[in-house]
């Protein structure tokens, strides 16, 4: 009897346990179903919000485009009126209401304001520039829906905090060199220009004439107050100046200054000189999308003209001619392109394969082999690729860098490649074996690198403001100190005796290399020999180049301009405003008859250098 009762109790307990288990299982299933429904509804809601936001941005873009077209007609009309009056006006570009308003002033396009004739002033202003939407893709989950990167970031390493602190300060233009005979322009200070942020995955890029600082992340949140319309006045009637034993130069078309340079090539003083106003037409070449202002103090040796405009789907980070001058290579997002220089036709595209096609992979630096058979590219994935141009396939992948590749160069004998990276190293690679044969360690990230034309020296620019020169055997032979901010570009002269450098301090420096003159290490000056310092850009100098005849230096800047510098006299020969965004890369053709530029406005351009008429 007891056993039957026990069995009954056990059965009841099992039934109760089973019922409780079934209840819990049902509750768990119901909770899971509710969770899935909630997650699905939240995701759908977020997608709808993003789509609505994208539609709003697209509508704003269409409205902005319509306003821009209307204002451009008025601007062109005002420009024609000013040219008829013989006046070169500062260009004032204003962004939409509620945004920053920045003044873009070219150093060769500043009008002298005559205080004695205020009645002759004329106020002009220009409307907002094209503001394209930067939200063409839904960003990854870990990213904000608001892109934070800017156009120039695709090329450049992080910007030091000291530069960020000074980015809002005004900058007086001019030239300083060690030759006291060289004079420079004394231009009014202008507010640095900024680029709105860009979504690298987007098909369209904001093309405001307001370039922001280059960097690999968003280091800058510029703020600027609106500026009133620019008062434009006719230039002063030139007055006869007392003859001087020293020749003078003005880098501005309408105003200039005399700068006495001390031993270090920096400013020592300024004296204003009278501008020249009777040769306006001879000093300026104007086209619909570009213009050139020539320095009236320089003898006209050559003119420049636009040959080809090469459109790209993204920011153009680098440009480079082949050694025979027939081809131009450009680097942009996920691709390197090769163009025919004569026709401007794209011959082919070398696609960079990314593990995630939706993410950006910019080709930051590029170079042809001397024989033209290979093209080497440096990208954000920390790899250097050597492409065989006959097959358009990768021959070698040089791996070893631990951060992005910012700069590289091919040796002139074709045997080696040098590269610089944010991992604080510069490396020398053997082209035949694909092996790293030399590793140079630096305290800060490498931003620029070049190998001398005689293949004996490697110059390295870095974030610590110093340029280091090594022998190819790995011996440090020279340190060039003088820049006040990071060095972003360097270039050797063809005879390897001169090095040109561009920096975030807005200057270009000309260095005399002691090591190439067989000077003993004990006799080399510790800080190097700076022959001249050129100051004319209103913003960061991002790229420099030296002409094949060693006569001219070329610089590209965040201020959207390119300048030619006479390396013999130190004068600014011309300024070219040829892009709507930062000029990130410049280079000369091997014969010196052309040069190329790459910009954040999604364009590369090929320009001709034509002899001036006698």
UniProtKB/Swiss-Prot annotation:
GO biological process terms, semicolon-separated: negative regulation of transcription by RNA polymerase II
Biased composition (Polar residues): 164-184, 218-228, 241-260
Keyword field contains ATP-binding: no
Compartments, record wording: Nucleus
Matching SMART domains: WD40 (SM00320)
PANTHER family xref list: F-BOX AND WD REPEAT DOMAIN CONTAINING 7, WD40 REPEAT PROTEIN
Family recorded in the similarity comment: Belongs to the WD repeat TUP1 family.
Name by which UniProt lists this protein: Transcriptional repressor tup11
Gene: tup11
